[in-house]
Swiss-Prot record:
Residue ranges of every copy of the ABC transmembrane type-1 domain listed in the record: 85-372
Native species: Mus musculus (Mouse)
Superkingdom, natural source: Eukaryota
Cellular compartment(s): Peroxisome membrane
EC number: 3.1.2.-, 7.6.2.-
Gene Ontology BP, a term: fatty acid beta-oxidation
Any one GO cellular component localisation term in the record: peroxisomal matrix
UniProt-recorded name of the protein: ATP-binding cassette sub-family D member 3
């Protein structure tokens, strides 16, 4: 007890009290964060995500399995560029460890020469250090080079894999419209991928170097002070590591929430840019400012909590992984020196004792620092678990969507009050799609939205090539829904749909999409220049397509086919619609869906375009309210918005409606 009481000084008691108080605060903060997460509910911009399916973000077997799955993507083969960089980093880490040991030994000899007043020894070892500086510097910078290149290689591999899945068929559309598990995929595909790759490589370096140091220093120290010293340090590493890992568990979850809030903040800013004109007309800047400030405030509050948590953990990490580890190191290294009966130093001179202490002490200090870095690496590993959970969730959703599986909260037909609703729930993909040329036939197909809201219970009609169809009805009646089912963007919930393959259907929206690229790219999209050559279509033929829609003058005005502009801004609304029709003439599909695509075009130009479509054999499904277009169609499909429809042939007795 007396031996213990000498440590109960006022200073030590204060430090222990501060550490205990901080642990209590940290525990209280963790509980508060958990309660806040339960009470606050779901974020307003991501309220589709199911609480029961949130990904875990802790360091466990699940994390290691996920990490292994992603590493197989980033390092696909035994012999590849990434393996080469991993090997380079490993060699540089070993070289750096040996450089550290050599610098300790050489530095001790320099100091020994100074203390022993030996000018010869001092100059010799100092010259050795000067001669080794270029090599040591080269090793350090080769290590940095390898780490940076490996981060980039990992990012390239993972990004290409994810975009290969994301841009396969209509997956990018389905993720935003048919599945509600992932919010803000742009955040995941860009920032999260970069941070994940950086974190993986940093962890590889921050774990490999300390392990190498420990192995080498244990070998050196065991021969110098015995095996008991290194064994004591390893035992301390195990105990402190388990304790700190337990305290760090919230970091993974907090990392996931940070990235979600960052994604929300990025999303509301992109909405402001995309819809700036509409917002300006409504004078909605104050409302948008409130929205942005609200989302930003939520992000800032979370970051404040995260910063405080990291401050608390940093305080405890510093004490346990650095300073207490140093104290343990001093206790271990001092034993053979303070034990006067120790056989190692019975006949050692003062100079030999000093040199031995410096070498052993510095090695043990470096070993304790290496142990501390391994303990602190647990913090990085917990943060990596957060990124790993998000990337793995994205990969799983992409895989599901590419196999036709998606998850979305279904709206019950009883709640919607639709008469004649099916007793059994709708099953996505339950219908049959048959690919046949020159015909579109809906055979007892329920027209429903992805969340199960039935627009038409049983839709049946048949159209063959050459018979144009005019589709009309109030907003929300199902006109666009019909096209989405026809284009296979939405699942078929039942019945049989007979139609040509996707490439033989073409959709022209009211607001045409202008791609990034040249004037030629606007006409041939989504084809490229090589595809144009394969089709055997010359630039002169492209010029004829522009002339057909009265856009021939644009070729000279914009500086030729290879002119690059921001075409969404350069072209007017009418020019963009006519450009989309020129694009239609280039592709010459069997069927074309025209969704109010000539609303900004004059009647005479519109009349010529429809006549030309008939001339080149393109059958049209047209959504329009213009009476002038009835003469170009043989049938009309009218939807009343209450679940009823009428499909009839247009005759002289048909009452035309529209403007």
């Amino acid at each position: 007890m007396a031996a213990f009481s000498k440590y109960l000084t006022a200073r030590n008691t204060s430090l222990a009290g501060a550490a205990f108080l901080l642990l209590c605060l940290l525990h209280k903060r963790r509980r508060a964060l958990g309660l806040h997460g339960k009470k606050s509910g779901k974020p307003p911009l991501q309220n589709n995500e199911k609480e029961g399916k949130k990904e875990r973000a802790v360091v466990d077997k699940v994390f290691l399995s996920r990490l292994s799955q992603i590493l197989k993507i980033m390092v696909p083969r035994t012999f590849c560029k990434e393996t080469g960089y991993l090997l380079l980093i490993a060699v540089m880490l070993v070289s750096r460890t040996y450089c550290d040991v050599w610098m300790i030994q050489n530095g001790t000899l320099i100091e020994s020469g100074i203390i022993g007043r030996s000018s010869k020894d001092f100059k010799r070892y100092l010259f050795n250090f000067i001669a080794a500086m270029p090599l040591i510097s080269l090793v350090n910078n080769f290590l940095k080079y390898g780490l940076n290149e490996l981060k980039l290689c990992f990012r390239v591999r993972l990004t290409r894999y994810l975009y290969e899945e994301y841009l396969q068929a209509f997956t990018y559309y389905k993720m935003g419209n048919l599945d509600n598990r992932i919010a803000n995929p742009d955040q995941l595909l860009t920032q999260d991928v970069e941070k994940f790759c950086n974190s993986v490589v940093d962890l590889y370096s921050n774990l490999s170097k300390p392990f190498l140091d420990i192995v080498l220093y244990i070998f050196k120290l065991t021969s110098a002070i015995g095996a008991q010293g290194p064994a004591s340090m390893m035992a301390y590493l195990l105990v402190s590591g388990l304790f700190l890992t337990r305290l760090r568990r919230p970091i993974g979850k907090m990392t996931i929430m940070e990235q979600k809030y960052e994604g929300e903040y990025r999303y509301v800013n992109s909405r402001l840019i995309t819809n700036s004109e509409e917002i300006a007309f409504y004078n909605g800047n104050k409302r948008e400012k409130q929205t942005i400030h609200s989302v930003f405030r939520k992000l800032v509050e979370h970051l404040h909590n995260f910063i405080f948590f990291r401050f608390s953990m940093g305080f405890i990490d510093s004490i346990i992984a650095k300073y207490v580890a140093t104290v343990v190191g001093y206790l271990v290294v001092s034993r053979p020196f303070l034990d006067l009966a120790h056989p190692r130093h019975l006949h050692s001179t003062h100079s030999e004792l000093l040199e031995d202490y410096y070498q052993s002490g510095r090695m043990l200090l470096r070993m304790s620092q290496a142990l501390g870095r391994i303990v602190l690496a647990g913090r990085e590993m917990t943060r990596l678990a957060g990124f790993t959970a998000r990337i793995t969730e994205l990969m799983q959703v992409l895989k599901d969507l590419n196999h036709g599986r998606y998850e979305r909260t279904m709206v019950s037909q009883q709640e919607k009050g639709i008469e004649g609703a099916q007793a059994s729930p709708l099953v996505p993909g339950a219908g049959e799609i048959i690919n046949t040329d020159n015909i579109i036939k809906f055979d007892h197909v329920p027209l429903a939205t992805p969340n199960g809201d039935i627009l038409i219970q049983d839709l049946s009609f048949e159209v063959r090539s050459g018979a144009n169809v005019l589709i009309c009805g109030p907003n929300g009646c199902g006109k666009s829904s019909l096209f989405r089912v026809l284009g296979e963007l939405w699942p078929l919930f039942g019945g049989r749909l007979t139609k040509p393959e996707r490439g033989k259907l073409f959709y022209v929206p009211q607001r045409p999409y202008m791609t990034l690229g040249t004037l030629r790219d606007q006409v041939i999209y989504p084809d490229g220049k090589e595809d144009q050559k394969k089709r055997g279509i010359s630039d002169q033929v492209l010029k004829e397509y522009l002339d057909n829609v009265q856009l021939g003058h644009i070729l000279e005005r914009e500086g030729g086919w290879d002119s690059v502009q921001d075409w969404m801004d350069v072209l007017s609304g009418g020019e963009k619609q006519r450009m989309a029709m020129a694009r239609l003439f280039y592709h010459k599909p069997q069927f074309a869906i025209l969704d109010e695509c000539t609303s900004a075009v004059s009647v005479d130009v519109e009349d010529y375009i429809y006549s030309h479509c008939r001339k080149v054999g393109i059958t049209l499904f047209t959504v329009s309210h213009r009476k002038s277009l009835w003469k170009h169609h043989e049938y009309y499909l009218h939807m009343d918005g209450r679940g009823n429809y009428e499909f009839k042939k247009i005759t002289e007795d048909t009452v035309e409606f529209g403007s």
